[in-house]
Amino acid sequence: MTELQSALLLRRQLAELNKNPVEGFSAGLIDDNDLYRWEVLIIGPPDTLYEGGVFKAHLTFPKDYPLRPPKMKFITEIWHPNVDKNGDVCISILHEPGEDKYGYEKPEERWLPIHTVETIMISVISMLADPNGDSPANVDAAKEWREDRNGEFKRKVARCVRKSQETAFE
């Protein structure tokens, strides 16, 4: 896949998302001159602790996309087992294709070139609704989610939701 083909694919995916928006998120370019850096706004899924939140994140695509996955980083603070303290998202769909050297993931759970921005975002929204506590990026959040989901974990998420609402459109 050439860089030109990659750029055309990203342009097509962005146009499709603008033409046919998907419930739960919106996407656009950070800089109109750079197809490889996107900003997404994710609406906290209904009936979850994240409901009502408006979380900003960045997707950074490699020049050989879709052969390799983008990186995703929350810009808005979020307390979640699968998001590290720097905001980096850790879910299977964003892991490099192939075998997992640690044996936690099957190859088909990892990045495949058939994935799109839409499938990535649906996976992230699903992750918000149902964290994977077995392979956390934020061990402290995972421990609280397992041991005190309706206590300290819920309080920290509620604080992040409030903060996201206050800063969503800055």
UniProtKB/Swiss-Prot annotation:
Description of post-translational modifications: Autoubiquitinated in vitro.
GO annotation, cellular component aspect: cytosol; extracellular exosome
Organism ancestry: Eukaryota, Metazoa, Chordata, Craniata, Vertebrata
Pathway assigned in UniProt: Protein modification; protein ubiquitination
EC number: 2.3.2.23
Residues annotated as domain UBC core: 5-166
Alphabetized GO MF terms: ATP binding; ubiquitin conjugating enzyme activity; ubiquitin protein ligase binding; ubiquitin-protein transferase activity
Protein name: Ubiquitin-conjugating enzyme E2 G1
Catalytic site positions: 90
Signal peptide (UniProt feature, chain positions): none
Highest taxon listed in the record's lineage: Eukaryota
Keywords, in A-Z order: Acetylation, ATP-binding, Nucleotide-binding, Transferase, Ubl conjugation, Ubl conjugation pathway
BP GO annotations: proteasome-mediated ubiquitin-dependent protein catabolic process; protein K48-linked ubiquitination; protein K63-linked ubiquitination; protein polyubiquitination; ubiquitin-dependent protein catabolic process
